[in-house]
């Protein structure tokens, strides 16, 4: 429906899990961020919008998606993004995140957003069952809420607070800098991964 008509319904909260991986240059309206923009345009000024989308949609990997991100910031405000457990949609292969926006208020250049790594959410995959809750899940959820609502501070490996650009990848992994000195095993593994990558690139020509 037309966003202006939907806005007349005076919705103050919007939530969405849009279709995944349908967008293309031929069908830019089917990109996840296009659905997000339409939802934001359909809400009243100051409304809160929460969407669960693939992490890849936060990167602006195509010109069309980059343009959508730029346009969203011209008219709406990004509050933050929470990176989720890779097995949230177990068996699907999509790594999701939750993005939170405020509708109808252009994103200020000095706005500080939160980017949270919630991949370790207290849920694990059980054989033949799927994703199950562990004993730590409730405490981890409470910790997430406490950090999001500024009740407590968190280490940057969990939450990075920063200003953003439309050209950024709106993900914790983009803004986080790990200044911890790696262990010898971590160093060896990283070098091994890099050499494997280089070898595969050479073999592919």
Give, region by region, the residue ranges found by the protein language model.
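A conserved structural/catalytic subdomain of Rossmann-like adenosyl-cofactor enzymes
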Residues: 5-8, 12-205
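Conserved SAM-binding strand-loop segment of SAM-dependent methyltransferases
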Residues: 1-2
